[in-house]
Amino acid sequence: MSPQTETKASVGFQAGVKDYKLTYYTPEYETKDTDILAAFRVTPQPGVPPEEAGAAVAAESSTGTWTTVWTDGLTSLDRYKGRCYHIEPVAGEDNQWICYVAYPLDLFEEGSVTNMFTSIVGNVFGFKALRALRLEDLRIPVAYSKTFQGPPHGIQVERDKLNKYGRPLLGCTIKPKLGLSAKNYGRACYECLRGGLDFTKDDENVNSQPFMRWRDRFVFCAEALYKAQAETGEIKGHYLNATAGTCEEMIKRAVFARELGVPIVMHDYITGGFTANTSLAHYCRDNGLLLHIHRAMHAVIDRQKNHGMHFRVLAKALRMSGGDHIHSGTVVGKLEGEREMTLGFVDLLRDDFIEKDRARGIFFTQDWASMPGVIPVASGGIHVWHMPALTEIFGDDSVLQFGGGTLGHPWGNAPGAAANRVALEACVQARNEGRDLAREGNEIIRAACKWSPELAAACEVWKAIKFEFEPVDTIDN
């Protein structure tokens, strides 16, 4: 009898409740290349052994429920069940374990991050037998990742579209984020772009509010970037936020952006949802638009160390769903992000093949095959003094985005943009000459100030600004 038709008629149905570990804890299991693998940080309730807790996670996120049901006999649990195949204690914690779970590929709809997350990070996170549960990492098999389009274009295609090579790209979020009229907003974009930036950006919560409707903003921003392009001879872009209350409205905004001829649109992928994001990514590939992704709401999910989901999982999900840029933290700015951990998921966004490296929080070797990469965006509380560190940490394939660090310049937006561009060019030149940006960064910036009054003014304003707080989410030691 085949596994799909196998039943338990020969032994009969036995009603009742039995321990999850009897069915779902299988330490002898050898994982398959086609399995989706998950690493969960599990904190059981007092008295619940780790084997039972890990098995409960495997069961409740796959085929199991709280009691035996007679319809179990109509399928093959051995074919479809999730399996907790390994458990290890968390260093420095008395009642916390990393439980590894393998899921058969057939549990998931092809090309659907929504379906994958509905199972793996669904109701199991409210399970009473667990005090806390966090998804630390996923291994996406090539057999599954190949069912996704992924980023609309990827890093190399974006470089070619923009004709910009050999350095990080520079951006700026327009501030104040809310309250400007469309014409004043467009003017701010123009000044930043003509001053030397590659991109300006809608803030994540700029959609279509009474003070600035989306269509007006799109028109004035398009005018700004075309004027800046004509003056500078460089291709410019503004991330037009297409996020909307419905998918239909979102696509309508993206269509209008394409009709204006702009190079890039934007989406808030967590608040907007993975289904909407994947739809927009498909539209962007079909119509030649780059897609910038903001991660608003991520910290609600990923900041606490014991419960939720690590951002590296959200980053992998975004690469599958589709986006050409995504905000990734700065390491040195105002937002959460430990250096090694941040670089770990930056590699997961950009590289084709990433080896397991627990020191950087990477639990599994990940092979993306031919899926395009995503450019990480460093944004949040950064200014010209951070430029050497950002250039050294993120490398060329990144966007360094200075909002207040551009618009807060004492002489205005265009001088603020010029200061950032001069600082970046100085750091790239110094790096290419073999200088150590980590050690000589301040010296490099001071030297550049001698021939850039805009940079000198920026350095004076932000010379004492630091954000020195310990990150909440750190690597286990």
Swiss-Prot record:
Binding locations of substrate: 123, 173, 177, 295, 327, 379
Record-annotated active site: 175 (proton acceptor), 294 (proton acceptor)
Residues bearing PTM N-acetylproline: 3
PROSITE patterns: RUBISCO_LARGE
Reactions accelerated catalytically: 2 (2R)-3-phosphoglycerate + 2 H(+) = D-ribulose 1,5-bisphosphate + CO2 + H2O; D-ribulose 1,5-bisphosphate + O2 = 2-phosphoglycolate + (2R)-3-phosphoglycerate + 2 H(+)
GO biological process: photorespiration; reductive pentose-phosphate cycle
Leader sequence residues: none
Alphabetic keyword roster: Acetylation, Calvin cycle, Carbon dioxide fixation, Chloroplast, Disulfide bond, Lyase, Magnesium, Metal-binding, Monooxygenase, Oxidoreductase, Photorespiration, Photosynthesis, Plastid
Sites marked Transition state stabilizer: 334
Primary enzyme class: lyase
UniProt PTM comment: The disulfide bond which can form in the large chain dimeric partners within the hexadecamer appears to be associated with oxidative stress and protein turnover.
Subcellular location: Plastid, Chloroplast
Note: The basic functional RuBisCO is composed of a large chain homodimer in a 'head-to-tail' conformation. In form I RuBisCO this homodimer is arranged in a barrel-like tetramer with the small subunits forming a tetrameric 'cap' on each end of the 'barrel'.
Role description: RuBisCO catalyzes two reactions: the carboxylation of D-ribulose 1,5-bisphosphate, the primary event in carbon dioxide fixation, as well as the oxidative fragmentation of the pentose substrate in the photorespiration process. Both reactions occur simultaneously and in competition at the same active site.
NCBIfam families in UniProt: PRK04208.1
Family listed: Belongs to the RuBisCO large chain family. Type I subfamily.
Name recorded for this polypeptide: Ribulose bisphosphate carboxylase large chain
Source organism: Lolium perenne
Gene name, Swiss-Prot/TrEMBL: rbcL
